Amino acid sequence: MITELHGIDIRENEPLKHYTYTKVGGPADFLAFPRNHYELSRIVAYANKENMPWLVLGNASNLIVRDGGIRGFVIMFDKLNAVHLNGYTLKAEAGANLIETTKIAKFHSLTGFEFACGIPGSIGGAVFMNAGAYGGEISHIFLSAKVLTPSGEIKTISARDMAFGYRHSAIQETGDIVISAKFALKPGNYDTISQEMNRLNHLRQLKQPLEFPSCGSVFKRPPGHFAGQLIMEANLKGHRIGGVEVSEKHAGFMINVADGTAKDYEDLIAYVIETVENHSGVKLEPEVRIIGENL
């Protein structure tokens, strides 16, 4: 118990595998669940005062936490999840579930968010990664974000300052953490929006191994190629290290089939990169983030 942070939900030495989509990850020294921006500011101020590292995990979807865990504070935004509409502008806190947010837009017959209807994760993580699928991406609808700087200051960042690129945003370099974001949507037809979301979800279910824990798409799309196709051509479908294997359903995914570890994921990623480069001459670049310490 940290007396200066009394009243905030903080768990000591908490295994992160219980919170990640991959079902791997060692313990966080302190895992915190702030309920509002005030509690978040208190946590960050305390960590900075004590020279303790801190980071935000979001919904921990496109992420691998190493088996040794993470030192200092890990902050999760599960309780910072409010979504509000003001006309055609949707504002969501960073912890809002991305899929549920697209459903809110649909309910109000607002179009623009359909592409994200099956992407796991949080609003904050989606902005950080410029998440996208089926021709759409966050940058197409993004207006602005309120962020927390590493020093604990809260400021607003515009779409221009985000400098979005493919699976990239400026805050990947600055260390700023999204705490809320605004998106510009357009009036649409409920049935049309619903049909498009059903179509995209059907495609996702057909092509992706949703029945297993995974970190989502492992590699960025190399120019002129598809990562999954290159992996398949290198005869790596079903290749397994420890409890993690390249999905038979979609070679761009790695799934946890038998109590795999973060080391299994890292070893398999390295093996796939090397094998594909030897086979095709293309060096794959991971899209998934890998953080934390090894055992």
From Swiss-Prot:
InterPro entries from the UniProt entry: FAD-bd_PCMH, FAD-bd_PCMH-like_sf, FAD-bd_PCMH_sub1, FAD-bd_PCMH_sub2, MurB, MurB_C, MurB_C_sf, Oxid_FAD_bind_N
Pathway: Cell wall biogenesis; peptidoglycan biosynthesis
Protein name per the record: UDP-N-acetylenolpyruvoylglucosamine reductase
GO biological process: cell division; cell wall organization; peptidoglycan biosynthetic process; regulation of cell shape
Active site, per annotation: R167, S217 (proton donor), E287
Gene Ontology molecular function, alphabetical: FAD binding; UDP-N-acetylmuramate dehydrogenase activity
Cellular component, GO, one term: cytosol
Domain of life of the native organism: Bacteria
Pfam family of the protein (one): FAD_binding_4
Organism of this sequence: Streptococcus pyogenes serotype M12 (strain MGAS2096)
Family statement: Belongs to the MurB family.
Principal subcellular localisation of the protein: cytoplasm
Keyword Cell cycle (UniProt): yes
